[in-house]
Amino acid sequence: MQLSLLKAKIHRATVSHSELNYEGSIAIDGLLLEAAGLYEFEKVHIWNVTNGARFTTYAIRAEHGSGIISVNGGAARYVQVGDLVIVAAFAQMSEDEAAVFSPNLVYVDAANAMTHTNHSIPTQVA
């Protein structure tokens, strides 16, 4: 059986640009792209924390260290500059692979500068 597990997440990034007339995609600061282990043109899910919108697109590289998170093309209709978003990608793997796998989790500040990384999410308690 193949399972779909979270591969990578950039948590609560701030949308810095929204370019309706640019070729579709989400441009992500190259530093964040690399830290998350995301590839250019990889399918990503975007979850808008600010308004609840959810959509998929593909990642492209923005300037390294720029803090750019730019939602482009038709997807720009789902965000506004200043919105908080989560960028996530999933990977297919066997149960054996899943048993030893851990995702790349990237956390950023309000300027999209990386604050820290992790490979697990703390257990939620009541």
Swiss-Prot record:
One of its GO terms (cellular component) is cytosol. Substrate binds at residues 57, 73-75. The keyword Oxidoreductase does not apply. The modification Pyruvic acid (Ser) is found at residue 25. InterPro entries: Asp_de-COase-like_dom_sf, Asp_decarbox. It catalyses: L-aspartate + H(+) = beta-alanine + CO2. Pfam families: Asp_decarbox. Its cofactor is pyruvate. The active site is at 25 (schiff-base intermediate with substrate), 58 (proton donor). Binds 1 pyruvoyl group covalently per subunit. It is an enzyme of class 4 (lyase). GO terms for molecular function: aspartate 1-decarboxylase activity. Keywords: Autocatalytic cleavage, Cytoplasm, Decarboxylase, Lyase, Pantothenate biosynthesis, Pyruvate, Schiff base, Zymogen. It is found in: Cytoplasm. Is synthesized initially as an inactive proenzyme, which is activated by self-cleavage at a specific serine bond to produce a beta-subunit with a hydroxyl group at its C-terminus and an alpha-subunit with a pyruvoyl group at its N-terminus. Pathway: Cofactor biosynthesis; (R)-pantothenate biosynthesis; beta-alanine from L-aspartate: step 1/1. Its EC number is 4.1.1.11. GO terms for biological process: alanine biosynthetic process; pantothenate biosynthetic process. Catalyzes the pyruvoyl-dependent decarboxylation of aspartate to produce beta-alanine. Belongs to the PanD family. Heterooctamer of four alpha and four beta subunits. This is Aspartate 1-decarboxylase.
